[in-house]
């Protein structure tokens, strides 16, 4: 998928870039049976208070139901019917039509095409788009949509252009290197999909103007030093100030390098090397 640029007919178009969408199937609306309504909460919790700042507005979306598991379709071949855009994630999605007639969406791997036949299960061939237990995937292969708990469905490596690499297999665990640089152990019966995720140019897209952020449901981010003392620890003062202290969050938590991870987490024993800072 290439990057599309615009002639600067207006100042807002000068730095704006978008994806070309040439690789997507033409004229395909999302399958109605695999979509549902999505109500935006505008960052509010159940009591109506803001729990996540800078959310609100944006274009309406239908949520596409994605199959992150693929366990109940072991050894049933599926044909790729279309590759579609999904407004709810950075990756594209692929519509699979199984031999038994059922249709499902999955995250679209890189280099798959309409008409390809995919499969899942321990005996599936080593091929891009096929889902297998980690113990059945050769060392050195790239994978995505990795399970952390057997049967829960893929939780790791699900965004555009993402991939992880199988480094080793020993006993009940497989060593996997994630794109963040973290190296961790994952139970060998957990399922992963072979290959990288497509739409790798997503990271190079420039929003270009404030209005597009609003289309995506993102509201402005106001600096703490521009607020009043009642709103932020950096607020107040006569004229422009530096904030007068080390950077903190609105609730006084030190930021910019302060470690917030719990010192004793159950998952520490599975992490061989922490992610790159």
UniProtKB/Swiss-Prot annotation:
One of its GO terms (molecular function) is transferase activity. Keywords: Ribonucleoprotein, Ribosomal protein, RNA-binding, rRNA-binding. GO terms for cellular component: large ribosomal subunit. Residues 32-58, 225-277 are annotated as: Disordered. It comes from the Bacteria. The keyword Magnesium does not apply. InterPro entries: NA-bd_OB-fold, Rib_uL2_dom2, Ribosomal_uL2, Ribosomal_uL2_bac/org-type, Ribosomal_uL2_C, Ribosomal_uL2_CS, Ribosomal_uL2_dom3, Ribosomal_uL2_RNA-bd_dom. GO terms for biological process: cytoplasmic translation. Residues 258-277 have a biased composition (Basic residues). SMART domains: Ribosomal_L2, Ribosomal_L2_C. Coiled coil: none annotated. PROSITE patterns: RIBOSOMAL_L2 (PS00467). PANTHER family: LARGE RIBOSOMAL SUBUNIT PROTEIN UL2M (PTHR13691:SF5), RIBOSOMAL PROTEIN L2 (PTHR13691). One of the primary rRNA binding proteins. Required for association of the 30S and 50S subunits to form the 70S ribosome, for tRNA binding and peptide bond formation. It has been suggested to have peptidyltransferase activity; this is somewhat controversial. Makes several contacts with the 16S rRNA in the 70S ribosome. HAMAP family: Ribosomal_uL2_B. Belongs to the universal ribosomal protein uL2 family. NCBIfam families: rplB_bact. Part of the 50S ribosomal subunit. Forms a bridge to the 30S subunit in the 70S ribosome. This is Large ribosomal subunit protein uL2. It comes from Borreliella afzelii (strain PKo). The lineage of its organism: Bacteria, Pseudomonadati, Spirochaetota, Spirochaetia, Spirochaetales. The gene is rplB.
